[in-house]
Amino acid sequence: MTDHSSDKTALVLFSGGQDSATCLAWALARFARVETIGFDYGQRHLIELECRARLLDGFRAISDDWAAKLGDNHTLTIPTLAEISDTALTRDVAIAMGADGLPNTFVPGRNLIFLNFAAALAYRRGITDIVGGMCETDYSGYPDCRNDTIQALQTALSLGMARDITLHTPLMWRDKAATWQLAQDLGGDALVDLIREDSHTCYLGERGARHDWGYGCGECPACRLRAKGWIEYASGI
């Protein structure tokens, strides 16, 4: 379950969703200490943020080693992002595809802003390793999730802070089925069950409908990706 390959501390972008929970387990397997950061940016619901505390409690219950490694959990409020983002994640509007081929769930600059704030916090705390759940395999086409974007930002952050910053994206080339499998490899059935029960992916914030893969509306793009990945993972495809 653990791989003591580093005596360093990592900061994980931890939203309370499936991907960030899996990334947290990945970081706990590789770093001596792990801190987490989440963002209240005026999203239309706060379900994911509410899931964070339950997930962290679950991680501590799964492994004494993980419990010992888990450090501070930070939450930053960025209301300005919602003020300049007219999207389905920050407004009560129907999810639809735009003329540019992107769904209106895309919040322009969100990951760029998150990573800049995370890097600023990491700098103050002497951390140079930041972990995020960005992925360009099973994803909605968001340009700020692409590997080229992350690599460019890593260079910019390192130059701007005069410090070698490493942005780790362990899910970048994994589809959702492989992400479920990674959770299994890192924490066994206990971690998979925790992610199913207590993580949240649904864009609409639905927690009333329970599926094999967890809670959600089952219809939004995020739910469909999560469900498809679960079916493929569970069937061994």
UniProtKB/Swiss-Prot annotation:
Residues engaged in binding Zn(2+): 202, 217, 220, 223
Keyword Electron transport: no
Pathway terms, separated by semicolons: Purine metabolism; 7-cyano-7-deazaguanine biosynthesis
Cofactor binding annotation: Binds 1 zinc ion per subunit.
Keywords: ATP-binding, Ligase, Metal-binding, Nucleotide-binding, Queuosine biosynthesis, Zinc
GO MF annotation terms: ATP binding; ligase activity, forming carbon-nitrogen bonds; zinc ion binding
Cofactor: Zn(2+)
Reactions accelerated catalytically: 7-carboxy-7-deazaguanine + NH4(+) + ATP = 7-cyano-7-deazaguanine + ADP + phosphate + H2O + H(+)
Any single biological process term in GO: queuosine biosynthetic process
Residues the record lists as binding ATP: 14-24
The UniProt record lists the keyword tRNA processing: no
UniProt cross-references to InterPro entries, sorted A to Z: QueC, Rossmann-like_a/b/a_fold
Stored Pfam families: QueC
EC id: 6.3.4.20
Function: Catalyzes the ATP-dependent conversion of 7-carboxy-7-deazaguanine (CDG) to 7-cyano-7-deazaguanine (preQ(0)).
Protein family membership: Belongs to the QueC family.
Protein name: 7-cyano-7-deazaguanine synthase
Species this protein is from: Rhodopseudomonas palustris (strain ATCC BAA-98 / CGA009)
